[in-house]
Amino acid sequence: MESVCFTGACPDMTREELTEMAEEKFEVKTSVTKDLDILVCADPNAGSSKLEKAKKNGTKVISYEEFLEMLDEDDDENYDDEEGLYTHAQAKQIMARLREAYGLEGARIKTTIAKKSLPMTASKFGGYPYWEKGAEYPHYDSEDEDEAKPFVLLAQINFAEVPPLPDYPTKGLLQIFTSSDDLYGMDYEDATKQELWRIVWHDDFSEEKAMSKRELRAMGVKSIVEALEEDNDALFPIEKEYALSFEKIVTIANPRLNVFEEYVRKAAKDLGLPVYEESALEMFGENDYNNFFESKIAQHQIGGFPFFCQGDQSREGDLLLFQMDSEMKKGICWGDLGVGNFFLSREDLKNLNFTNVLYNYDCD
């Protein structure tokens, strides 16, 4: 097994995510040693010490993009082009066309476990929510207790921190609250019923207007970390507080979406390839089919195409408001490695109307 070491910041994933991908086929080292086979320079402006040492040792130095191509080439050896109606080469053409002509812009959310409590107005998973002094805090009715309980914060998105996306707000604070429940508050019978979960939007907010953590605690408000510490039976998809960063991405339709086969046929027609009426499972071999999911990294996301474990639960015309994936190494897990997503219509999003949001959670 060849050894590899990385230097510089990756443009579209964390070092941890890149390492996880590489470990499937390489021995990953943290320093440049004499027996190192490959040094991947993820950032051309990265420090020169590792580069100089690698060149001195005769280590092969490649770019981040070249390394990803190496991973793809290794995968190609395991493909059977005869498995599907489309060959592997044709499948790659179709995937590229889907991204080029039919891709949807979104914002990928990267998580970092917070070392200390984050500012009240910051984008975050978990932690304490922003809440304006004097405003009534949202509660839910608990089957276990006589009195209503304060919601806990699942996610808070400060849209001033999010890359601009068509029809999405460029400012304002979105909050998603949840309750301790085996379905994380979701209602299978009515996915828009905000009884055990809640969406709250703030147009005008600031640190100066925010209640302090002490004031929130006095009202009975807890972070998810505190709720888990106080109740061993509490169930939430996250275990900690997470700082968030955002980057714009282009997503493509995946086989779990109702529109996938329609987009594949459009792409095939554009490329002058045969257009099949068979299902996606027949059109593509197993490996090619799975490649459309692009699921090598956690898909926490705003906008773009959603991801489902079981099947498309969105309504026709819905946009993805927010999606939280499972990220086991960081203590984020929806059931059995599932995903939670929230949808609304384009018109409701433009009007900042969050009363008809659809909440779905599923897992394998």
Indicate where each model-derived feature is located:
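DNA strand-break repair and replication-stress modules
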Residues: M1-D80
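Preference for intrinsically disordered or flexible, low-complexity segments
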Residues: Y79-D364
